[in-house]
Every structure is written in C-alpha cells, then in structure tokens.
Amino acid sequence: MQALVQVRGPVDMSRDIQDTLEMLNIHSVNHCALVPETDTYSGMVAKVNDYVAFGEPSEAVLTDLIESRGEPASGAGDVDDAWVAEHTEYDDVADLAGALLAEETTLSDAGLAPVIRLHPPRGGHDGIKTPASDGGQLGKHTTEEIDHLLTDMR
C-alpha cells in the first residue's frame, strides 16, 4: 500500500492529470490517499508523478496518521481504538493500520473517509518542483522519507 500526497497545486495542470488525481481520491493540495500497489494504480501514480509525493509508510506512522487526521465516512467524531473496535472488525487502530498496509482492507471499507486531509508540512516542503532523487519533494520516496513527510504534515 502506498501513501500519495498531493504537493503541487492545479495551476497549469492538464485535465488528464486532474482526472487521474480525482480517480485516486485526491482533490486538493495536502490531501493523502492510500492506494494498492497494482499495475492499474502504478500507471496512475506514474502519470501524476510530477504533482505528488508517494511511498510506503511504516505501520507506526500510519497508526498516528489515522488517529490524528482520520475521519469517519459519515458523521463526525474522533477515530480512536474504541471507534475502530465498534465500527470495524479490527480491535484497535494499529491492527487497522497493519491491515491497510497488507492491503486486506481500504479506508472506505473500514468506514473511514477515503482521503486524509493533512496540514502543510512543518518547516515547509523540501522543494515542490524538484524530484526526491535531487533532494526535492516530488515522486517516489523511501519509507523513512515518506514517514518524515507524513509526520511533518500531521
């Protein structure tokens, strides 16, 4: 499972890229979606590579992200261990995060909103016009790099 975070805005973005981001449930800057690592999604991720940061997060960071920024699909409330135990088949948020990373379930199937709305990163982006391989923010990240970005955006 990969976490995709849109870091660039819609200015001069082609309609094809906008459509692909909408299909990935990413509708705005600083929104995050979790997508499985299949051939179909790999092609979509490659298409939006110049507008997103993506990588596989660790279970601990995903647990923190769901607890702090996760939202129920309907209604309001905090997503904590009690909510997860009551509304899903998992005992706590850590079990849910593990199932998400193992691609056993999705945020929507678990009763959560399919997108995680994040804050801008504390300390700013490392460069939204430069790929991660050159020290920027765009494109594929290692687990440590995407964990650092998601932690800064909690």
UniProtKB/Swiss-Prot annotation:
GO cellular component, one term: cytosolic large ribosomal subunit
Transmembrane segments: none
SUPFAM superfamilies from the UniProt entry: Ribosomal protein L30p/L7e (SSF55129)
Keyword entries, A-Z: Ribonucleoprotein, Ribosomal protein
Region entry Disordered, spans: 122-141
Superkingdom of the source species: Archaea
Signal peptide: none
Keyword NAD applies: no
GO biological process: maturation of LSU-rRNA from tricistronic rRNA transcript (SSU-rRNA, 5.8S rRNA, LSU-rRNA); translation
GO molecular function list: RNA binding; structural constituent of ribosome
Record-linked CDD domains: Ribosomal_L7_archeal_euk
Family of the protein in this entry: Belongs to the universal ribosomal protein uL30 family.
Subunit structure: Part of the 50S ribosomal subunit.
NCBIfam families assigned to the protein according to its UniProt record, in alphabetical order: PRK06049.1, uL30_arch
The protein's name in its UniProt record: Large ribosomal subunit protein uL30
